[in-house]
């Protein structure tokens, strides 16, 4: 969930997931 579900967010925060 969270950033991991949003490609743009995941792209700028890869280590969050």
Swiss-Prot record:
Sequence positions bearing Cysteine amide: 17
Tissue: Expressed by the venom duct.
Domain of life, per lineage: Eukaryota
Family the UniProt entry places it in: Belongs to the conotoxin A superfamily.
Disulfide bonds: 3-9, 4-17
Domain comment quoted from the record: The cysteine framework is I (CC-C-C). Alpha4/7 pattern.
General function of this protein: Alpha-conotoxins act on postsynaptic membranes, they bind to the nicotinic acetylcholine receptors (nAChR) and thus inhibit them.
Cellular component terms (Gene Ontology): extracellular region; host cell postsynaptic membrane
Main location: secreted
Modified residues (Sulfotyrosine): 16
Organism: Conus anemone
Compartments where located: Secreted
GO-annotated molecular function: acetylcholine receptor inhibitor activity; ion channel regulator activity; toxin activity
Protein name: Alpha-conotoxin-like AnIC
Keywords for the protein's UniProt record, in alphabetical order: Acetylcholine receptor inhibiting toxin, Amidation, Disulfide bond, Ion channel impairing toxin, Neurotoxin, Postsynaptic neurotoxin, Secreted, Sulfation, Toxin
PROSITE patterns: ALPHA_CONOTOXIN
